[in-house]
């Protein structure tokens, strides 16, 4: 609870999510530092959440050069909300430098929806990607989370419900599916304490 929280936000909707989280935590516990990577015009969502944050007289720093990088202590917690699932090309320039800088720190890194530098549905091999300790992703796992080469970047994954209509998710077209405990649970029937293994069929591997 006493750890300093450093938010690094982009200018898109993922950055807007980061600013919204920063606002809630600022009201809850303080000790929050907020940095926005200047990468072009801000999305409407980002602008809205920045405005709400400024109403709290929050101090927001813009990062334009490496000289604007803050000191990151090993005891700090970095919340990264730079690009999310909207990334379409490998990181370069100031974004790449910032991610490399964060990777050199020993701080705990929490990525929002998708670690910066990671593509949502293709391999990011040989790209610069932030090494998240935790990834808080929204509504459903991303294909990138299933790729072996991405294991060192995603850390511990939590899938969060953000209120999207269940029907929207169910009707989304995809050729990729995952199996979890909840989806297979109906196949397992209650067993008596003294049952024999041959009472429950056979499995062919």
Where do the model's predicted regions map?
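Short gly/ser/thr-rich secondary-structure transition/capping motifs
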Residues: 58-65, 92, 117-120, 183-189
């Amino acid at each position: 609870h006493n750890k300093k929280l450093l938010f690094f936000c982009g200018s898109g909707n993922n950055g807007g999510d980061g600013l919204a989280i920063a606002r809630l935590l600022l009201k809850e516990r303080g000790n929050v530092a907020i940095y926005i990577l200047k990468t072009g015009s801000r999305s409407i969502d980002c602008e809205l959440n920045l405005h709400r944050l400024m109403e709290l007289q929050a101090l927001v720093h813009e990062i334009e050069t490496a000289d604007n990088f803050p000191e990151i202590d090993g005891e700090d917690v970095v919340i990264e909300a730079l690009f999310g699932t909207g990334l379409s090309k490998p990181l370069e320039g100031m974004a790449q430098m910032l991610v490399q800088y964060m990777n050199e720190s020993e701080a705990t890194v929490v990525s929002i929806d998708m670690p910066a530098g990671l593509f949502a549905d293709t391999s990011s091999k040989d790209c610069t990607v932030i090494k998240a300790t935790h990834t808080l992703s929204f509504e459903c796992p991303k294909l990138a989370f299933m790729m072996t080469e991405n294991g060192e970047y995603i850390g511990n994954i939590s899938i969060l419900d953000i209120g999207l209509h269940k029907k929207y998710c169910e009707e989304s077209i995809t050729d990729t599916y995952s199996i979890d405990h909840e989806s297979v649970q109906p196949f397992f029937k209650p067993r008596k304490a003294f049952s024999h293994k041959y009472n429950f069929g056979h499995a062919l591997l």
